[in-house]
């Protein structure tokens, strides 16, 4: 009988611990949901900026495109596409030094993309860096 009472008492003493874990779990779930919602919001914002930048680029508003791509890069500095498109826009504005910096970063992020090497070479050629263009 004493053994049963001891087991019951021990079991009852664990209830507050279980409640504490349940509360911590609920807090964790709420925090996770908040982080996910913020990430979705950032992704939607970046997609809108990407569309806006692409439209501006297509309509030859290169300064506007650079602004949009730069905003994307503030949230995601390793976005290859935004870097590459910003570099192209800078090239069209004859900012070849800025374009070379962006192409170089794009190459560091994805060295498999030959187009960044090619376009960086074109910008170096425009700056009369013929050896660097090769």
Segment roles from a protein language model:
Residues 2-134:
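Alpha-helical tetratricopeptide repeat
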């Amino acid at each position: 009988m004493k053994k049963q009472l001891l087991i019951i008492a021990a079991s009852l003493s664990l209830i507050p611990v279980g409640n504490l874990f349940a509360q911590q779990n609920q807090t964790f779930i709420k925090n996770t949901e908040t982080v996910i919602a913020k990430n979705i919001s950032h992704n939607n914002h970046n997609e809108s900026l990407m569309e806006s930048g692409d439209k501006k680029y297509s309509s030859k508003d290169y300064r506007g495109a650079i602004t949009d791509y730069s905003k994307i890069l503030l949230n995601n500095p390793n976005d290859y596409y935004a870097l590459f498109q910003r570099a192209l826009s800078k090239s069209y504005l004859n900012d070849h030094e800025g374009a070379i910096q962006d192409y170089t970063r794009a190459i560091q992020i994805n060295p498999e993309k030959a187009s960044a090497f090619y376009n960086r070479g074109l910008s170096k050629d425009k700056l009369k860096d013929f050896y660097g263009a090769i």
